[in-house]
């Protein structure tokens, strides 16, 4: 009787034991898991998450091995993260051991490559468990929602970026000058008949400039000099007389030619600067010694004496250098006045061959009509095919029109002519908008000196998830991307100011303002801005309907009437 009762009792205990073990390795509550961030967010093209999990007390079978895999799921797809494996106390292995009695905590870091479908997704933990050779089923646990993808808007705001312009070097007024020298004999100030030919040729140039319709005389300078030999007192009188005689002659000639031009006259008693310049350019013996004397002594008399002491070269100086310093220099300063804006604009459309490359490129800046600008730049590529700027600027127009492939073609053509910093920067923008961050960074590295480089680097930093650095790089730039960086860096006041001053606002300007409204709890800003965005780009309604930036508005009737 006792044996009959004992056997069924033993079997019942075994069944109960296995039943108990199975329950302990069963479903885990979501309360045992926390995820940072609570709502997953795309950063630099990735969706990172830190998962803190816990196996409760008396749960983890001593012979169990459990593999935990983060899985991000969305409608029609999923992405798996790196799994982690845990083992019970009686398992021989190298994985983290979890105590049956005390349970155990663990931390997992995971990251998924972002795809747009993840905007409406859920993060699960999936379990693969065995006890010995027996497979144990542990249901998957949902631990987070995702994905806030605001950073990925950089792929859209890039279209609002400013490509670098190949700027013209047009100058309406170009300053020019014409020089002539009236030479004098040693210790003389009279103008010799042999020098009158020089004066006559100079006066002829003055007359030509005066008569030219596109030239204007500024003034004529008379600068008279004496060579350093002979003492300060003598040379002062000598230089003054040379200046006086030259000015008198020039004034007489101008009056005779009926030319009204101001004369600015001055004299230099001892032309040590001219002496030093001529010696430096010469091949005379002991040149370095002479130059050293000039640097060591400032007193004119001492300089002259020390140089005379270098007897080996003084005769050469007297014969070759000093005579060139006994002169009056005549300088005609005048301006070449270029075509007016009206003339350039008219010729650009009617007879562009009359314009040089700088004038033609400048003509494109006189209109805000992209079609007219394109026509001008196209003409420039025909007239000046070896100038990269027109090709580059056609690429800029195509980029701003949203035609990335056409822009790339023009930028590559420009690069084949001249791989300038501007062209490299623009090719970097193309690479960035096509998702090749490494190539973009390489191109930007060759774009030093371009005005727009800070803005372009700001876009790259957003794409890399470096938001504070992006804000600094944008500076005071007023673009959608600059505002996006400020939103991501949580500088909402600055972002609002930036969006209000975007030069070429578009649908994404309004969409970012709606995001800003959601982040600052301004419901009227959300609805009004989103309504404006959808009016410009209807596809943004569908995006807003699943954008977790607006999660708390998904039950708002006004919001849902727009995002439908």
Question: What is the predicted function of each stretch?
Answer:
Residues 2-513, 517-546, 552, 560-564:
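N-terminal targeting segments with Sec-dependent signals, encompassing both cleavable signal peptides
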């Amino acid at each position: 009787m006792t044996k009959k009762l004992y056997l069924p009792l033993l079997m019942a205990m075994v069944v109960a034991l296995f039943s108990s073990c199975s329950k302990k390795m069963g479903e885990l509550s979501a309360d045992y898991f926390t995820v940072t961030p609570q709502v997953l967010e795309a950063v630099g093209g990735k969706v990172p998450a830190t998962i803190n999990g816990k196996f409760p007390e008396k749960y983890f079978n001593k012979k169990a091995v459990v593999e935990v895999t983060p899985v991000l799921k969305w409608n029609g797809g999923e992405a798996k993260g790196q799994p982690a494996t845990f083992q019970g106390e009686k398992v021989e292995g190298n994985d983290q051991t979890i105590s049956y009695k005390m349970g155990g905590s663990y931390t997992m870091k995971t990251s998924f490559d972002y795809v747009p479908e993840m905007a409406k997704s859920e993060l699960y933990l999936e379990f693969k468990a065995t006890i010995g050779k027996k497979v144990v089923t542990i249901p998957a646990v949902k631990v987070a929602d995702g994905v806030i993808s605001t950073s990925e808007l950089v792929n859209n705001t890039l279209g609002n970026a400013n490509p670098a312009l190949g700027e013209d070097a047009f100058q309406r007024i170009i300053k020019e000058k014409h020089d002539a020298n009236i030479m004098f004999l040693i210790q003389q100030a009279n103008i010799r008949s042999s020098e009158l030919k020089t004066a006559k040729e100079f006066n002829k140039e003055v007359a030509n400039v005066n008569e030219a319709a596109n030239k204007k005389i500024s003034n004529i300078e008379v600068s008279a000099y004496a060579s350093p030999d002979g003492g300060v007192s003598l040379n002062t009188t000598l230089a003054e007389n040379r200046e006086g005689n030259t000015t008198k002659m020039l004034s007489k000639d101008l009056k005779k030619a009926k030319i009204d031009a101001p004369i600015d006259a001055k004299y230099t008693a001892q032309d040590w600067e001219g002496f030093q310049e001529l010696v430096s350019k010469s091949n005379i013996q002991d040149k370095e010694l002479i130059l050293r004397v000039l640097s060591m002594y400032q007193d004119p008399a001492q300089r002259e004496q020390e140089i005379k002491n270098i007897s080996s070269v003084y005769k050469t100086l007297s014969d070759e250098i000093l005579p060139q310093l006994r002169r009056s220099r005549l300088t005609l300063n005048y301006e070449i006045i270029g075509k007016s804006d009206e003339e350039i604009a008219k010729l650009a459309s009617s007879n562009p061959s009359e314009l040089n490359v700088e004038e033609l490129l400048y003509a494109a800046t006189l209109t805000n009509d992209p079609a007219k600008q394109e026509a001008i730049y196209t003409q420039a590529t025909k007239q000046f095919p070896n100038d990269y700027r027109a090709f580059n600027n056609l690429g800029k127009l195509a980029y701003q029109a949203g035609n990335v492939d056409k822009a790339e073609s023009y930028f590559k053509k420009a690069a084949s002519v001249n791989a300038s910093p501007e062209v490299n920067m623009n090719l970097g923008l193309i690479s960035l908008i096509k998702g090749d961050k490494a190539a973009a960074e390489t191109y930007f590295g060759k774009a030093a000196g371009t005005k727009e480089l800070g803005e372009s680097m700001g876009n790259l930093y957003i794409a890399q998830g470096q938001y504070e650095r992006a804000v600094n790089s944008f500076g005071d730039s007023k673009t959608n991307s600059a505002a996006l960086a400020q939103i991501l860096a949580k500088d909402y006041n600055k972002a609002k100011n930036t969006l209000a001053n975007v030069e070429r606002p578009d649908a994404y300007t309004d969409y970012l303002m709606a995001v800003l409204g959601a982040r600052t709890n301004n419901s009227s800003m959300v609805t009004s801005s989103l309504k404006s965005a959808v009016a410009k780009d209807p596809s943004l309604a569908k995006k807003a309907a699943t954008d977790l930036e607006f999660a708390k508005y998904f039950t708002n009737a006004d919001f849902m009437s727009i995002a439908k």
